[in-house]
Each structure stands twice: as C-alpha cells, then as structure tokens.
A protein has these predicted regions:
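Short, catalytically relevant binding-site loops at active-site mouths
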Residues: 99, 146, 152-156, 172-176, ...
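Extracytoplasmic ligand-binding site segments that recognize negatively charged/polar headgroups
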Residues: 2, 10-144, 176
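A ligand-binding cleft/hinge motif common to bilobed small-molecule-binding domains
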Residues: 21-25, 145-164
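N-terminal secretory/targeting leader peptides
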Residues: 157-163, 167-176, 181
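Mature extracytoplasmic/periplasmic domains
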Residues: 184-245
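A bilobed periplasmic-binding-protein/Venus flytrap-type ligand-binding module shared by bacterial periplasmic
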Residues: 62-69, 108, 178-193, 212-213
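Conserved C-terminal helix/tail region of periplasmic/extracytoplasmic solute-binding proteins
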Residues: 239-271
Length: 271
C-alpha cells in the first residue's frame, strides 16, 4: 500500500484495516471517499461523522491461560497485574505493536491508562514478543502462564481444535478494537468502482453481513445484534467494561508510543 501511495493512485477499491487510527491517517491524506450509509444509525461503535470510514467488526484484546495447567486464582485478573506480577516473570507473552495494528491499539490504550510505566513493567517482567500462534502453543506446553491476545484467536482454537485454552476478561477492562472499512476516493482509485463499494459497505453493515463477522469469531457492530462469537460473552457487556482507545492519540502519537515501547521492551529481531 505504501508503495502504491507514492504513485498517487491505489489499485484497490476498498480497504479493511485493523483499527481506526490508520483510517484517520488515510482520511487526512485525502485517500478516502465519503459515503453516508443509511445503516449508520444502527451502529453501536463510533464511525466517521463525515462518512469516510465505518466499523464493520470488533476485535477484543484479552488475556488467556491454560486451565489444564493453571487455575484462575493463580493468574492476573487485570492487564495491570499481567505486567506487574513478578511471579510471572519470563512467562508472559504478547504481540508486537510495531507490526500489529491491534497490539498497537492495545498498548496505546494501556499507556493512556497507566502511563509509559506500564511498558517498563512489561520489560521488567521479561514479556515475550511473538505471534499469537506461537503464544498459544506456549500456553499448551506450559512455557507461558498467561498471554495477551485477541479473543478471536482463542475462540477459533477452542472450536476448531478442541483446545481448553480460556479467556480472562480483565477486571480493569477489555480493549475493544473496531476494524474499519473505507472506499478509496475516485481521484485516487485506478478503478473508480464507487457505486459497488457503497453497496458492499451497506452489505457488510447489514445483519446478513454481520453474521459472517460473528462466524469469524469477532463481535458485531450493530445495535441489538444478539449473536456472539462461539464461546464468547455478551457484546453489550463487553462495551460496558471497554477500557477504550483514544484513536486520535493512537494516530498522532504513534511514533512516540512505539519508541517508548521499544525502549522498555526487548523485541526480537526478524530472522
């Protein structure tokens, strides 16, 4: 995408990205088409008031553990304890905020709530930075006691592989992360399929479209949508305990947040 941007034209008609911060950047850069979808009044998550982006599915950052090896009483009940409990030193894992949009959103939220000292605590506790699949494998073997991970990864593992890995919904709040859909502006698009893109946006935000999101282990963005992902909990209940993400801060202070994280936490070099 970055390479295409240098040419001034994008080959894609639409984009679906992990979180709204990147949508703010694309909007500011003039890359997006504004569309006033009639579905917007049914949304229970924020959207761009000028119609440049809409949430279409919701990821949920949680903690996870292996109940065959640990009991909930032995493990942190909050994201704060996850970072600060020294009995877990070297036995915790999370994703890489430099490469993962959802992990970036999570560390932005946690540093907003607890300050950059949160990163220092993670570093002091020797948090391992790795992919979700690697972290889940380490939970299975007992190399990790608890991990920070997207709920959908745990639910998928439970349904498709019969895993016993379970979620902890932290008492200091879950971190809900809406993935956003956008249409490329006509003067920035190689194809100019605006009408089709608007129709797809409406479909993604319809009840039928939202059922596919839930089947993919993510939560619906629609008000009154009662279906939840396999083995998950009520979406409105999660909204009530959402820690929240300041998306403007996540965008405008992205470099600072990443730098502070790198200064505190060891990130393995790519092989």
């Amino acid at each position: 995408l970055a390479g295409e941007m240098e040419t001034g034209t994008l080959g894609c008609d639409m984009m679906l990205v992990a979180e709204p911060a990147y949508s703010l950047e694309l909007k500011e850069g003039g890359w997006l088409h504004s569309y006033d979808t009639p579905v917007k009044e049914n949304l229970r998550f924020p959207y761009d008031e000028e119609g440049y982006w809409y949430p279409v599915r919701v990821c949920n950052m949680v903690l996870a553990y292996n109940p065959e090896l640990k009991t909930p009483e032995e493990l942190p009940k909050t994201f704060k304890e996850f970072a600060e409990d020294t009995s877990l030193k070297g036995r915790i894992s999370m994703g890489n905020p430099l490469t993962s949009g959802t992990t970036m959103a999570a560390v932005a939220s946690l540093s907003d709530k607890y300050g950059y000292e949160y990163f220092t605590a993670l570093g002091n506790n020797d948090v391992m930075i790795e992919s979700g699949s690697t972290a889940l494998a380490k939970l299975q073997t007992g190399e990790c006691d608890v991990i920070m991970i997207l709920e959908e990864s745990v639910l998928k593992e439970r349904k498709e592989n019969g895993s016993k890995i379970a979620c902890i919904y932290p008492d200091d709040g879950v971190i809900l992360i809406p993935s956003t859909v956008m249409t490329v502006a006509e003067d920035r698009s190689a194809n100019m399929n605006i009408e089709a893109c608007e129709a797809i946006t409406d479909y993604l935000l319809s009840e039928e479209g939202q059922k596919f999101m839930v089947e993919g282990y993510m939560h619906s963005v629609l008000k009154g949508f009662s279906e939840v992902p396999f083995d998950s909990v009520d979406t409105d209940g999660l909204i009530e305990k959402d820690m929240g993400v300041d998306w403007v801060r996540c965008y405008t202070m992205r470099d600072e947040i990443r730098t502070k994280f790198q200064e505190a936490v060891t990130i393995p070099e790519k092989k």
